[in-house]
Amino acid sequence: MNSVANVGSSSSLFLNLLELAKSQRLALGDVFKFAESFSAEGRKGEAVELYKTWLAFNEAHPGAQMVYFNYSVMLRQLNDIPGSINAMRAALKIDPMFGPAQINLGRAFEDSGSFPQAIQQWRSFVESTSETTPDRLSYRVMAMQHIGRVMENAGLLEEAETILWDAMELRPEKTETGQHWSAIRQRQCKWPIITSSSHVTQRQMIDSMSPLTLGCYSDDPMFQLARAYEYNKSFVGRLDLRNFPRKTVKQKTGTGQRLRVGYVSSDLRDHAVGFALREMLELHDKTSVEIHAYYCGDPVANDATQTRMKAAVDVWHDIGTLTDEAAARQIASDEIDILIDVNGYTKHARTKIFGYRPAPVIVNFCGYPGSMGSPFHQYMIADAQIVPPSSEIYYSEKVLRIACNQPIDRKRFIAEKPSREKAGLPENAFVFACFNGMQKITAGTFEQWKTILTATPGSILWMLSGNEKADQRLLAMFVAAGIDAE
């Protein structure tokens, strides 16, 4: 096959490429090069058409499975999930052990909402690679990670824990596997959280913990700061900043210009963080600040909190589909003065965006109470409860203090106070309460609860329900300590 040289303008180039593909004169490398170029220019439809045409006339080519793979990925990006599934199946018909296609076929099933089919797809691949090469082992572990992730999201915690442990036994250096495994153990109150085997050491397990998980595991502030630093270094790494000149702080006071403040979060919706922030966004003094919201979460429909937030800010940006670099470019082009990270190290965080330093001032606020341990978060907004003055040495950020760090929406509907009977509580008992998630309950805390309840006859502990099996596990431990589970 021939390579493509200069073949004219952009529109004529596309038509010439189609003709070359039809006559089997378009080299495989050129298919990828031009399709990727079209995609980067926002011409994804033309990229899809180029792949489709080439495949129609070159299906016998020894590299056809790779073109089917790229074609499928592009269709998935355009939300043509059935087409993506068919293309990925075609790739696997040519090469049944094509690891990336095995993984992405499961992802396409997941996108279609067929979670059992996604899990079965990955399981079949895992079973077919029990005797395999080092390269295929990597894809086998990846498939196991996806199974664990989907099961975790579906609340199948014990099943997810089992498959992730098997993945760790195969590749203990894959920290993302251990990160999910330890978090799942916490949600089930399985103590001790950390275990080891002949293949996985205790040190590897601890090193795989995310800062969020570690915050529920250890109260050692130096340990938490060190883990945040290491996590940031490995997760964000050394980004290419050559096209991101360092932003300088602009003096705007007295110039008539408004300060541009940007909030980046996946939780600007019906979510605990969204509930906290919505009135705060409404209360900004719009004569002195211009508010930009950068939403990096999944699309939501008919979301009352997001609707209210969109009305409160000056500019709303959906950046969920953008790469970290593209999102950082968007923020930089908006000339944001102060960029606020509302996620920290919580779920769906886009920490790499901040690594590009798209604003001169970057602040950690509201979503994550720990230190980011990063070189690009300069400040953290906190109060005396979140960061006592004596604890500031354990934060890489300069701590800026306000009276209360927890925004409250005063317009939020408050239900009528229920009676004890309606809440399922005894009329005359003293009620201790804990409405934290299960992952925040430690073995030490549980021992203290047992001591308190035993020393306080007639009292009860009112808890937030978690996973059904975790509830049963805690109740069984209370009963074993002589405390009535009812």
Model-derived segments and spans:
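Glycosyltransferase donor-sugar binding loop
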Residues: 295-300, 460-475
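Short hydrophobic signal-anchor/transmembrane segments that target glycosyltransferases
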Residues: 280-287, 443-457
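Feature representing long, continuous alpha-helical segments
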Residues: 275, 446-447, 472, 476
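Short, well-ordered beta-strand segments
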Residues: 260-262, 433, 462
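Short, surface-exposed connector motifs at secondary-structure boundaries
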Residues: 288-289, 333-336, 430-431, 454-461, ...
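Alpha-helix N-cap/loop-to-helix initiation residues
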Residues: 270, 324, 441-442, 467-471
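Charged, low-complexity intrinsically disordered terminal segments
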Residues: 425-427, 436-440, 444, 464
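Alpha-helical solenoid repeat scaffolds of the TPR/TPR-like class and their adjacent stem/linker regions
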Residues: 1-426, 437, 479-482
